[in-house]
Design a protein with these regions (language model features):
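A short coil-to-beta-strand element that immediately follows conserved catalytic motifs
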Residues: 62-70
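Conserved N-terminal beta-strand and adjoining loop/helix that marks the start
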Residues: 1-21, 71, 89
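Conserved Nudix-box catalytic region and its N-terminal flanking loop in Nudix hydrolases
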Residues: 17-57, 61
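Nudix hydrolase/Nudix homology domain
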Residues: 31-34, 103-150
């Protein structure tokens, strides 16, 4: 039996507004890697309830959680980190990002709405995020093990 840690489970939101996707910085204090908002799940709360909490913490927005649209795994090939992200399509009541909003955990410091063309110029994970967000016909439902990037 391996002594590696168990995979971490996280939830993420695909939030679209006027053909733009909501992204947040993926690493504390750095903005060179972008991802969909979300985070680790806590026990005894449903995946949608975890996602509602995480999106609000990171963006100040309130979402209604829809159907799952992607399961993505990533890991550190040289370590024992392995995370399974479950992405859900979400709806919002309003798209205005409050400039004074602060993530209570201090991880997310930048949030933005991006078009597909703008997203193509950014470093984004997972690699399949654009295809899933814009519902391409060939978008995967499962994106297997990607190496983590820093």
């Amino acid at each position: 039996m391996s002594s590696a840690r168990q995979p971490r489970i996280a939830v993420r939101a695909i939030v679209m507004h006027e053909s733009r996707l909501l992204l947040v910085n993926a690493w504390k204090g750095r903005t060179h890697l972008w991802c969909a908002p979300g985070g680790g799940v806590v026990a005894h709360a449903s995946l949608p309830d975890n996602l509602i909490r995480e999106v609000h913490e990171e963006t100040g927005l309130k979402v209604t959680v829809g159907v799952p649209c992607l399961v993505n795994e990533f890991h550190d090939p040289t370590g024992d980190f392995h995370q399974v992200d479950i992405y859900f399509r979400c709806q919002i009541a309003h798209a205005k990002l409050d400039l004074d909003w602060r993530d209570p955990e201090g991880i997310v410091t930048h949030r933005r709405w991006v078009s597909r063309a703008e997203m193509a110029q950014l470093r984004v994970k997972p690699d399949s995020l654009a295809a899933v967000a814009w519902a391409d016909a060939d978008a995967p439902g499962y994106d297997p093990l990607e190496p983590i990037v820093a």
